[in-house]
């Protein structure tokens, strides 16, 4: 439950980074930090507790006139996994020369082996984190090309990561990379941003690029260069966020959960709008894209998800059996991915996720693909990893859900699952006698 925001452009970076961190507070965290870069090099600030504590440190330690000189920076909210919630363990973390710094979401699984090797070579670690093993490893590989150093370091890393990297010797760029932890690049006029969640970008741009696993990008004020792990240039689509700033603000409510409870009627309307053919009593879900041949071969539906999405699937299970006349079951994605699930081309797997980035659900999709199974996605976020991985499915159009406790996303998921059950049922020529009306 960490957050990343980065900025490079011509505007003062500090307020943009702090504003981004505040948009990411909903993810939960125990400390925060940022790194700013100018001609004099890197400057970092860290604080335990709320982002407000970090703001206090900035006000106390950074002269007001200095704010204008920093037009490049990266920032992070941390939820402790390796090491206690202390300032030393807060991000960003440096390499040995203290010219390279990194913010990181995810877990470096082989960090102990990397740490021990580097210690044997004379490195003295400042923190207890897995991230510092990565930042120092990047420094070891740095010989004037930050992107190449990141590529080489990541080739030695096992685990999940979403990272943003700064180097004092290359102040005109931020290097970013993703594997198993979401990152999205935002593009403005003469500026670029990167964040772990699009909600941190909505105040600055509507034009975004969602990175895929294995992508390594270099962003400058005027360009985005994305390559794969073999250093080959690749193209990623530019998407429109389609969000306004009001969607990620409380709007007069005491907290986001209360706001989102009251948004449920509208979110259900959005989920159903334009998707019901009242004349024929059918659902219009072109995104499912299931041919009559594929529909005829479905013998079982397997709904996979985690948390709230898993519970939405439990409701959907009854609907598919009752309305579609197809055997259905619900499985925890975190367990499905580690088993040898008995699924094949006669099964339909429906992967449910609000964010479209749930790591266990993504892994479950890939496991199902290995078995030759048909897969549909049911997600809220357009352009998310699950939407791209499945290639077909349905969006719930609930808008951003900031509260950790899901409300409108759950009701939207249930509404769309009922539509999907209706669509499959009508496709199998079930009628009134079978309980559809």
Regions found by a protein language model. Give the residues of each.
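Conserved short alpha-helical segments that host acidic/polar catalytic motifs at enzyme active sites
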Residues: 1-255, 263, 269-302, 338
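Hydrophobic face of alpha-helices
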Residues: 131, 135, 147-150, 258, ...
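Internal active-site segments that recognize and position negatively charged phosphoryl groups
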Residues: 255, 259, 309
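Acidic-histidine catalytic/liganding microenvironments
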Residues: 264-265, 323
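Glycine-rich phosphate-binding loops that contact phosphosugars or nucleotide phosphates
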Residues: 296-436
């Amino acid at each position: 439950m960490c957050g990343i925001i980065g900025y490079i452009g011509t505007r003062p970076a500090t307020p943009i980074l702090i504003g981004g961190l505040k948009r990411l507070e909903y993810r939960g965290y125990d400390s925060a930090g940022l790194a700013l870069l100018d001609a004099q090099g890197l400057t970092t600030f860290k604080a335990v507790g709320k982002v407000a504590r970090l703001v206090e440190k900035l006000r106390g330690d950074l002269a007001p006139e200095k704010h204008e000189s920093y037009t490049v920076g990266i920032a992070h909210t941390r939820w402790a996994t390796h090491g206690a919630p202390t300032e030393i363990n807060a991000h960003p973390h440096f390499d040995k020369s203290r010219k390279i710094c990194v913010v990181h979401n995810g877990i470096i699984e082989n960090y102990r082996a990397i740490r021990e090797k580097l210690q044997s070579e004379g490195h003295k670690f400042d923190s207890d984190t897995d991230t510092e093993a990565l930042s120092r490893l990047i420094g070891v590989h740095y010989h004037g090309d930050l992107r190449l150093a990141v590529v080489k370091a990541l080739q030695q890393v096992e685990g999940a990561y979403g990272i943003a990297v700064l180097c004092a010797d290359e102040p005109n760029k931020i290097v970013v990379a993703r594997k198993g932890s979401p990152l999205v690049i935002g593009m403005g006029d003469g500026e670029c941003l990167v964040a772990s969640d699009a909600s941190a970008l909505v105040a600055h741009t509507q034009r975004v690029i969602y990175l895929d696993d294995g992508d390594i990008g270099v962003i400058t004020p005027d360009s985005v260069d994305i390559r794969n792990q073999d250093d080959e240039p690749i193209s990623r689509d530019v998407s429109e966020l389609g969000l306004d700033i009001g969607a990620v603000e409380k709007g007069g409510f005491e907290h986001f959960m209360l706001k989102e409870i009251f948004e449920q009627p509208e979110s259900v309307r959005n989920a159903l709008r334009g998707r019901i053919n009242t004349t024929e009593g059918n659902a219009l879900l072109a995104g499912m894209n299931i041919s009559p041949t594929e529909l005829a071969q479905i013998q079982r539906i397997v709904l996979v998800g985690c948390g709230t999405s898993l519970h939405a699937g439990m409701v959907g299970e009854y609907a598919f059996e009752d309305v579609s006349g197809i055997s259905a079951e619900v499985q925890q994605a975190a367990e499905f991915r580690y088993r040898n699930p008995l699924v094949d081309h006669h099964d339909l797997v429906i992967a449910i996720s609000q964010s479209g980035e749930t790591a266990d659900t993504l892994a479950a999709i890939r496991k199902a693909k290995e078995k030759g199974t048909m897969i549909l996605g049911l997600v809220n976020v357009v352009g998310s990893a699950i939407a791209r991985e499945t290639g077909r499915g349905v969006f719930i159009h609930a808008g951003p859900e900031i509260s950790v406790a899901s409300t409108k996303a759950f009701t939207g998921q249930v509404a769309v699952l009922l539509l999907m059950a209706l669509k499959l049922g009508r496709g199998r020529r079930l009628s009134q006698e079978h309980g559809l009306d």
